[in-house]
C-alpha cells in the first residue's frame, strides 16, 4: 500500500471520526473553513463521534474552532458549512454506529474517511466499516503521528 495525496474534489462526502475531539477543534475545522473559503471543499461533512450532541451543539463546536482561528469568518461560508454538517453519534465498538453511518452514506460513491481518533480505536473503526460493506470507492486517511 502506498500513500498518495487525496484530492477532496473527487470526494462526495468527508467523514470525520472524532469530530467532537481536540484534533478536529484545533486543526480540522479551521482547515475545512479555509478549504471552503478557497472553493476546494465541495462536499458535505459527516462527523462521527461518541459525544451525544445534537446538530446545534456540533455546529457550535465547529464554529467556535473556526472563530478562534479566523476572527472575522465569512458568514456565507459559515452558513454553507452549517447546511453541509451532520453528526452520527455512537460507540466506536458498537455495530449500530456503522449501520447508522452506512444509512447516511447510502447514496455516496466516493467518501473520504478521516480518523481523528486515538490509534487504539483504528481497528474497531476499520472492522466496523468493513462489516457494513464498503462503498464502491473509499479513501481512508490517518493522521501522521510523529514520535521523537
Model regions and ranges:
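A structured beta-alpha segment of the ubiquitous adenosine-cofactor-binding alpha/beta core
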Residues: 70-110
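Glycine-rich phosphate-binding loop and adjoining beta1-alpha1-beta2 segment
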Residues: 41-81
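N-terminal low-complexity, Ser/Thr- and acidic-residue-enriched intrinsically disordered segments
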Residues: 1-51, 55
Amino acid at each position: 500500500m502506498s500513500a498518495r495525496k487525496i484530492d477532496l474534489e473527487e470526494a462526495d462526502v468527508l467523514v470525520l471520526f472524532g469530530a467532537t475531539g481536540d484534533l478536529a477543534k484545533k486543526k480540522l475545522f479551521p482547515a475545512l473553513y479555509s478549504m471552503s473559503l478557497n472553493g476546494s471543499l465541495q462536499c458535505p461533512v459527516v462527523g462521527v463521534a461518541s459525544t451525544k450532541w445534537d446538530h446545534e451543539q456540533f455546529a457550535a463546536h465547529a464554529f467556535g474552532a473556526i472563530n478562534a482561528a479566523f476572527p472575522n469568518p465569512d458568514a456565507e461560508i459559515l452558513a454553507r458549512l452549517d447546511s453541509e454538517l451532520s453528526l452520527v453519534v455512537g460507540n466506536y465498538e458498537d455495530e449500530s454506529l456503522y449501520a447508522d453511518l452506512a444509512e447516511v452514506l447510502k447514496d455516496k460513491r466516493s467518501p473520504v474517511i478521516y480518523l481523528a481518533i486515538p490509534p487504539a480505536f483504528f481497528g474497531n473503526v476499520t472492522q466496523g466499516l468493513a462489516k457494513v460493506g464498503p462503498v464502491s470507492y473509499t479513501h481512508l486517511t490517518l493522521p501522521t503521528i510523529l514520535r521523537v
